[in-house]
Amino acid sequence: MNFIESFDMDDEEKEKLLEKLASQQLRADYRKALGSEHKRRYMDMEIEKIFKKGKKDER
C-alpha cells in the first residue's frame, strides 16, 4: 500500500493498520528491552567474577 492508496481506506482499515503498526512497535521495544536486560545481567556477572577473584587473591 502506498501513500495515495491510504486516502482511499475506510476507518476500519485505517484502525487495523494502526493496530498492526502499534503491535510491531511494541514487539520492537520489547526486543530492545530484552537486549538491554541481557547486557546488564552480563555486566553484573562479570563484575561479580572480578570481585570473587579479588577476594581469592586477598587470602
Curated annotation (Swiss-Prot):
In which domain of life is the source organism classified?
A: Archaea
Q: What is this protein called?
A: Uncharacterized protein AF_0956
